[in-house]
Amino acid sequence: MSFSFLFLGNLPLAEGFGINTNIFETNIINLAAVVAIVISFVGKNLSALLEDRRKTIVNNLQEASQRAAEAQERLNIAKNQLEVAKKKATEIREEGVFRATQEINNCVAQHEERLSKLEEFKQETVQFYQQKAFKQAYVYIISRIMSRVKERLNKGLDATYHVVVNNFYVSRFTEYNP
């Protein structure tokens, strides 16, 4: 009767030890022996090594998760700072527009005030020169009248002039009602 060993072939019973020339069977037996020796001697070390590797991987994953959470938190902080900066920039822009508008209004008001002062000065200047012109005309007319009076006085008074002056005063007396 034959007994099958791992489907590798038929081994006769009770024949004892001998040289097995089937390379495939011997390789499997050798491999099984090596695996058994490795597992028995290296098994604990290998399982410890695998456990250390598992712990390292778990720690790396936890650290990566923690770093990701920290990065997310820093990102949120940066986003908040960006929003604050945008609000501040908007406020600064609005304040700049407000100040520019205010400055323009101040300049316009100052310009209008200067224009009104210039208009007032112009009116005063025109009035001054009008008064000066009237005064010069008045002085000229008075000087002409005075020169004509002097001429008349120097020439002497003739009879017709006496009659005109006397008639003037007589007419004034007749109009007088006390």
UniProtKB/Swiss-Prot annotation:
A single GO molecular function term of this UniProt record: proton-transporting ATP synthase activity, rotational mechanism
Keyword Transit peptide on entry: no
Keyword Kinase: no
Gene Ontology cellular-component terms listed: chloroplast thylakoid membrane; proton-transporting ATP synthase complex
Location of this chain's protein in the cell: Plastid, Chloroplast thylakoid membrane
Oligomeric form and interacting partners: F-type ATPases have 2 components, F(1) - the catalytic core - and F(0) - the membrane proton channel. F(1) has five subunits: alpha(3), beta(3), gamma(1), delta(1), epsilon(1). F(0) has four main subunits: a(1), b(1), b'(1) and c(10-14). The alpha and beta chains form an alternating ring which encloses part of the gamma chain. F(1) is attached to F(0) by a central stalk formed by the gamma and epsilon chains, while a peripheral stalk is formed by the delta, b and b' chains.
Function text: F(1)F(0) ATP synthase produces ATP from ADP in the presence of a proton or sodium gradient. F-type ATPases consist of two structural domains, F(1) containing the extramembraneous catalytic core and F(0) containing the membrane proton channel, linked together by a central stalk and a peripheral stalk. During catalysis, ATP synthesis in the catalytic domain of F(1) is coupled via a rotary mechanism of the central stalk subunits to proton translocation.
Similarity field: Belongs to the ATPase B chain family.
Name of this protein: ATP synthase subunit b, chloroplastic
Species this protein is from: Tetradesmus obliquus
Gene designation: atpF
